[in-house]
């Protein structure tokens, strides 16, 4: 008997059911690699970032995640080179899918009990996705921006439901806008730390810190005449 199609598990109807010591015998997910490409390139090299965002609340199987990753990676390797991008899968298939196997051969009514004891056995895994949650993210150079968007458009056909391709205004995978990143870089306030940067804070006395300069004023020494 084959596996039940993933369309039977598309809707989120029950609570999360992760793998645990009570839920054993779970098959391994099909997707095993979540970062592809030049994943060790510093944050300065890939300023452009684009996301594939889910527009439905649904379950996405591990097979669909692997198919989308392969489709996006194959297109980017062809047009941007294997060192010209960084692809990251942003969701993980932790939810376990169950199936109550039913016999369909002749004489099956004597072997099975219908819906009595219908708690099924694990048959696969999927990711629980919310509306507006990012599925895939690609960072690259600005000259490969069109290729990154086309790669995500091709990967979109591997997923159920509706998705949108959204170009991020931030610098790469960081949380800072391009203007802030370039400004802090000229001021030597931001340092590359792998994929993400490290923002250096102000040090020293409180009066020398820029965020507090507007509130901390130098002390005024009153003369003896005014005190008297």
UniProtKB/Swiss-Prot annotation:
<dbReference type="InterPro" id="IPR036920">
    <property type="entry name" value="Ribosomal_uL16_sf"/>
</dbReference>
<dbReference type="InterPro" id="IPR018255">
    <property type="entry name" value="Ribosomal_uL16_CS_euk_arc"/>
</dbReference>
<comment type="subunit">
    <text>Component of the small ribosomal subunit. Mature ribosomes consist of a small (40S) and a large (60S) subunit. The 40S subunit contains about 33 different proteins and 1 molecule of RNA (18S). The 60S subunit contains about 49 different proteins and 3 molecules of RNA (25S, 5.8S and 5S).</text>
</comment>
<protein>
    <recommendedName>
        <fullName>Large ribosomal subunit protein uL16</fullName>
    </recommendedName>
</protein>
<keyword id="KW-0689">Ribosomal protein</keyword>
<dbReference type="InterPro" id="IPR016180">
    <property type="entry name" value="Ribosomal_uL16_dom"/>
</dbReference>
<dbReference type="InterPro" id="IPR047873">
    <property type="entry name" value="Ribosomal_uL16"/>
</dbReference>
<dbReference type="GO" id="GO:0003735">
    <property type="term" value="F:structural constituent of ribosome"/>
</dbReference>
<dbReference type="InterPro" id="IPR001197">
    <property type="entry name" value="Ribosomal_uL16_euk_arch"/>
</dbReference>
<dbReference type="GO" id="GO:0005840">
    <property type="term" value="C:ribosome"/>
</dbReference>
<dbReference type="GO" id="GO:0006412">
    <property type="term" value="P:translation"/>
</dbReference>
<dbReference type="GO" id="GO:1990904">
    <property type="term" value="C:ribonucleoprotein complex"/>
</dbReference>
<keyword id="KW-0687">Ribonucleoprotein</keyword>
<dbReference type="Pfam" id="PF00252">
    <property type="entry name" value="Ribosomal_L16"/>
</dbReference>
<comment type="similarity">
    <text>Belongs to the universal ribosomal protein uL16 family.</text>
</comment>
């Amino acid at each position: 008997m084959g596996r039940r199609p993933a369309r039977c598990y598309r809707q989120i109807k029950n609570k999360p059911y992760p793998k645990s010591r009570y839920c054993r015998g779970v098959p391994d997910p099909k997707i095993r690699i979540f970062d592809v490409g030049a994943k060790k390139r510093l944050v300065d090299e890939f300023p452009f970032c684009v996301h594939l965002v889910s527009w439905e609340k649904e379950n996405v199987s591990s097979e669909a995640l692997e198919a989308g990753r392969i489709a996006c990676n194959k297109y980017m390797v062809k047009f941007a080179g294997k060192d010209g991008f960084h692809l990251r899968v942003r969701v993980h298939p932790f939810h376990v899918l169950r199936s109550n196997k039913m016999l369909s051969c002749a004489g099956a009514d004597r072997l099975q009990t219908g819906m009595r004891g219908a708690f099924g056995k694990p048959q696969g895994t999927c990711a629980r996705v919310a509306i507006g949650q990012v599925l895939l993210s690609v960072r690259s150079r600005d000259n490969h921006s069109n290729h990154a968007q086309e790669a995500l458009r091709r990967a979109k056909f591997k997923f159920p439901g509706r998705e949108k391709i959204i170009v991020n205004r931030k610098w790469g995978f960081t949380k800072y806008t391009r203007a802030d990143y370039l400004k802090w870089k000229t001021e030597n306030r931001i340092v590359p730390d792998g994929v993400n940067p490290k923002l250096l804070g102000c040090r020293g006395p409180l009066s020398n810190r820029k965020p507090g300069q507007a509130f901390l004023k130098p002390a005024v020494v009153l003369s003896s005449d005014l005190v008297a």
